[in-house]
């Protein structure tokens, strides 16, 4: 097998996905980073929005091992929010906005989230649900108003928590699976031979798109 397979001298060295992303921002600031049917952001635009979110969260005390809940439709800012949480040093747990109230409540209470990020529209639609939760609801529109759009100086270690994903709960209560930064960094391995593609299509549930 070793004779058949192409050998590579590539050696994996850990870098958190936040730094890998910032490197792409430096290399390709004006290239499209994310696009939907309604809008698109370049790497520079996505990074700026993520930084405003990150700096807002840091000011509120988000840091290492703090899980932040996310309830958003699939949109370009969904990726800005995830990146912003990671840039703040936190981790994220996502619940799709069409999930039943009981499931959303279980996920966020089980994960112990201090904050949930959502939009004004979703907050209005799910007002009854959010009123039952003990965490603070943060509106995306307000987080994006933070004047500090610079990259946060956050140190992320290999085994810091990156995100928490929940099973369907079809055989009982949903179970949270903790994913560390080393796992995600290895998945998006920066070996150029593994990155020769323009991008990918994300069509699954927002709560499963990192699985």
Over which residues does each language-model region extend?
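Residue-level recognition of the N-termini of beta-strands and the immediately preceding loop/turn
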Residues: 66, 202-203
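Low-complexity basic/metal-binding stretches
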Residues: 190-194, 198-200
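Carrier-protein-dependent adenylate-forming modules in NRPS/ANL systems
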Residues: 1-185, 195-197
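Short, intrinsically disordered, charge-balanced linker/junction segments flanking boundaries
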Residues: 204-211
């Amino acid at each position: 097998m070793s004779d058949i397979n192409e050998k590579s001298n590539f050696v994996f060295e850990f870098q958190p996905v936040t730094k890998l992303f910032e490197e792409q921002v430096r290399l390709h600031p004006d290239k499209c980073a994310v696009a939907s049917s309604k809008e698109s952001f370049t790497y520079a635009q996505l990074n700026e929005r993520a930084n405003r979110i990150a700096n807002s969260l840091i000011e509120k005390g988000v840091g290492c091992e703090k899980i932040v809940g996310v309830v958003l439709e699939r949109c370009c800012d969904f990726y800005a929010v995830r990146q912003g949480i990671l840039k703040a040093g936190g981790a994220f747990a996502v619940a799709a906005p069409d999930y039943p109230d009981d499931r959303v409540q279980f996920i966020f209470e089980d994960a112990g989230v201090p904050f949930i990020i959502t939009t004004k529209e979703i907050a209005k639609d799910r007002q009854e649900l959010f009123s039952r939760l003990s965490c603070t609801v943060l509106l995306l529109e307000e987080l994006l108003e933070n004047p500090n759009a610079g990259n946060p100086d956050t140190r992320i270690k290999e085994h810091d928590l990156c995100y928490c994903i929940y099973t369907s709960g079809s055989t009982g209560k949903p179970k949270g699976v903790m994913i560390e930064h080393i796992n995600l960094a290895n998945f998006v391995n920066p070996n150029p031979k593994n990155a020769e593609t323009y991008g990918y299509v994300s069509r699954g549930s927002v709560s499963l798109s990192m699985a």
